[in-house]
């Protein structure tokens, strides 16, 4: 990404600097967050109900959204200067197109992160809703999850008891108990 916008200089707060240098901190932070997010997602692949990892993923996504928004703001702030440089012949058409692609890429990346965070929040709401349904069912029947171990299986019962069951697992439990 960073190599795409070489040779473009902009003025920020009265100082002339290369666009790459202006984005250096934001890009470094983005790379660090991406690496950490990949580690968390790898853990979640093996343990999808890990509450600590889910909380970390949500926090990292939020930080990544903030960071990407900051990058997009810097790119948008430089846009007029870059356009003027292109019109005056100070930068090539290639450089200008690369700058435009960088803005597009950053916008799409930001939208993807927001969707990912939204999907995560929707999953949390589904888990909360299914948990409430199970609690209502247990209180209405006067039974506990252990009473349904035969129908649910020990793995599902343990996931429900430890709070690591996914919304799909909770829906499955509701379906099995409701029979």
Identify the meaning behind each predicted range:
Residues 1-4, 8-18, 22-50, 54-88, ...:
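Residues at a specific register/face of alpha-helical coiled-coils
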């Amino acid at each position: 990404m960073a190599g795409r916008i070489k040779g473009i200089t902009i003025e920020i707060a009265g100082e002339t600097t290369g666009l790459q240098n202006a984005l250096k901190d934001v890009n470094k932070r983005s790379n660090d967050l991406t690496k950490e997010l990949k580690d968390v997602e790898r853990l979640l692949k093996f343990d999808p109900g890990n509450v600590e990892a889910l909380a970390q993923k949500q926090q990292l996504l939020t930080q990544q959204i903030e960071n990407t928004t900051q990058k997009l703001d810097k790119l948008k702030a430089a846009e007029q200067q870059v356009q003027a440089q292109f019109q005056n012949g100070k930068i090539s058409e290639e450089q200008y197109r690369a700058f435009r692609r960088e803005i597009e890429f950053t916008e799409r990346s930001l939208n993807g992160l927001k969707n990912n965070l939204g999907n995560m929040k929707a999953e949390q709401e589904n888990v909360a809703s299914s948990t409430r349904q199970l609690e209502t069912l247990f209180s209405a029947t006067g039974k506990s999850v252990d009473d349904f171990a035969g129908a649910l299986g020990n793995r599902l019962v343990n996931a429900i008891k430890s709070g690591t069951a996914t919304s799909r697992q909770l829906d499955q439990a509701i379906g099995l108990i409701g029979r």
